[in-house]
């Protein structure tokens, strides 16, 4: 999915923004701003909403980097990471040699999200719970928990589907049994 604007490289992997990303950025900013509207007023609420939306997408990039760096460690080429309307996607070239390798690449993204949840949750404890910074960090932590858990759902478009496919491959010895 190499469409949109190239905004940089991470570990030699080109990072792209699809034009649809701006739609979800606006939506995520709005939703998160409403969360703080009554307590902090419009200006701070919208500012916090925007920062949280950007941090959400940084989290998605870290999630995709998890997949990508594990794939690279296995000798698999990663062509790009693209952020778009539904999140992000790492364009990984080629097939895994073993079900274990496929499992590792698939589980890496959700594990990164869960580690971010844990680290951000701990970081939020350093700030008063009623502070804008503390609540914003906690909100991004919660989003990472949701991202990690959601992606483990065993549907083939999700990481959990890829995990299940790798497990079925391991059990049956057939790479394709898990997708029929």
Residue ranges and their predicted role:
Residues 1-180:
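Hydrophobic transmembrane alpha-helices and their immediate loop junctions
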């Amino acid at each position: 999915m190499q469409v949109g604007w190239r905004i940089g490289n991470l570990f030699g992997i080109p990072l792209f923004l699809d034009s649809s990303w701006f739609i979800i950025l606006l939506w995520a900013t709005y939703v998160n701003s409403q969360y703080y509207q009554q307590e902090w007023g419009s200006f701070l609420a919208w500012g916090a909403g925007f920062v949280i939306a950007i941090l959400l997408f940084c989290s998605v990039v870290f999630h995709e980097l998890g997949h990508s760096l594990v794939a690279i460690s296995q000798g698999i080429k990663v062509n790009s990471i693209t952020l778009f309307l539904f999140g992000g996607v790492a364009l990984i070239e080629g097939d895994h040699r073993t079900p274990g390798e496929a499992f590792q690449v698939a589980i890496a993204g959700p594990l990164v999200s869960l580690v971010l949840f844990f680290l951000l949750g701990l970081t939020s404890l350093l700030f008063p719970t009623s502070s804008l910074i503390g609540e914003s960090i906690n909100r991004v932590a919660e989003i990472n928990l949701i991202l990690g858990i959601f992606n483990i759902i065993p549907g083939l478009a999700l990481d959990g589907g890829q995990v299940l496919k790798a497990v079925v491959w391991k059990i049956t010895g057939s790479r394709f049994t898990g997708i029929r």
